[in-house]
């Protein structure tokens, strides 16, 4: 990834300062919002015990699932680099549109990579490769009662660099959504039902019985002919 140079957005500086502060700090997210102001309490970013996702090299990243998202509701993803807590990327969405991007100055992890799907549930995800630059903590954010809260926390690590916990195995690939898994299950069920239906249809035509009768008739004659030839 290229190093980005230029002026530093004031909002980004304020956000980074908030991360290092011990007192509660809030970021105003309401300037482009049609609803009431939603505030991000930065101290909450470290208040949830992390979960772990172990993965090999491949397509992976934080995937956030949301149900019953209204048009004016704010959701988002915050990324914290595994090797440096000060490297943070934050994207916020409202009504399928990016409303705020506190992008890291040197490494924009989520830029041109964060995507959104709304069928059947709202999903924020990216298809970036898992590299040393994209491993870290991903927090799924949602505005609740005027405060941006973490509803899910995900750690992504390279399986080749970190030992897996005993018996943990690899987690389900995060790019597999609920609707995609449902489609695969539905296709399997259709094939199974079709096979059963075809079997009973052939059974109704007495084709299996006729086939068995022909085999029973032919086999004794063939066996008798072989004995005669001997």
Curated annotation (Swiss-Prot):
Its main location: host cell. It is a single-pass membrane protein. GO terms for cellular component: host cell membrane; membrane. Keywords: Glycoprotein, Host membrane, Membrane, Signal, Transmembrane, Transmembrane helix. InterPro entries: HCMV_UL16_sf, UL16. Residues 206-230 are cytoplasmic. It comes from the Viruses. It is found in: Host membrane. Residues 22-184 are extracellular. The keyword Membrane applies. Residues 1-21 form the signal peptide. Glycans are attached at residues 35, 41, 68, 84, 95, 101, 132, 145. The keyword Transmembrane applies. The chain crosses the membrane at residues 185-205. Pfam families: UL16 (PF17622). Plays a role in the escape of host immune response. Blocks the interaction between the host KLRK1 receptor with their ligand ULBP1 and ULBP2. ULBPs activate multiple signaling pathways in primary NK cells, resulting in the production of cytokines and chemokines. Therefore, the sequestration of diverse KLRK1 ligands in the endoplasmic reticulum and cis-Golgi apparatus of cells by UL16 inhibits the activation of NK cells. Belongs to the HHV-5 UL16 protein family. Interacts with host ULBP1, ULBP2 and MICB. This is Protein UL16.
């Amino acid at each position: 990834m290229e190093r980005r140079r230029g002026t530093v957005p004031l909002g980004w500086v304020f956000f980074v300062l908030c991360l290092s502060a011990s007192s509660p700090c809030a970021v105003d997210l309401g300037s482009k919002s049609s609803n009431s102001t939603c505030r991000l309490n930065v101290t909450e970013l470290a208040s949830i015990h992390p979960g772990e996702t172990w993965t090999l090299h491949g397509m992976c990243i934080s995937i956030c699932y949301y149900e019953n998202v209204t048009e004016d509701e704010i959701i988002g993803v915050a990324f914290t680099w595994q090797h440096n807590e000060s490297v943070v990327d934050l994207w916020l969405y409202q009504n399928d549109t990016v409303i705020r991007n506190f992008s890291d100055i040197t490494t924009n992890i989520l830029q041109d990579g964060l995507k959104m799907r709304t069928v059947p549930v709202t999903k924020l995800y990216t298809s970036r490769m898992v590299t040393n630059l994209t491993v870290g903590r991903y927090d799924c954010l949602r505005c609740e009662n005027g405060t941006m809260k973490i509803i899910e926390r995900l750690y992504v690590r390279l399986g080749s660099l970190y030992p897996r916990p005993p018996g943990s195995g690899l987690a389900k690939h995060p790019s597999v959504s609920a609707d995609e898994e449902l489609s695969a299950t539905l296709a399997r069920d259709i094939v199974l039902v079709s096979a059963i239906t075809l079997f009973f249809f052939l059974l109704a035509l007495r084709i299996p019985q006729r086939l068995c009768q022909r085999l029973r008739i032919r086999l004794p004659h063939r066996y008798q002919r072989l004995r005669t030839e001997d």
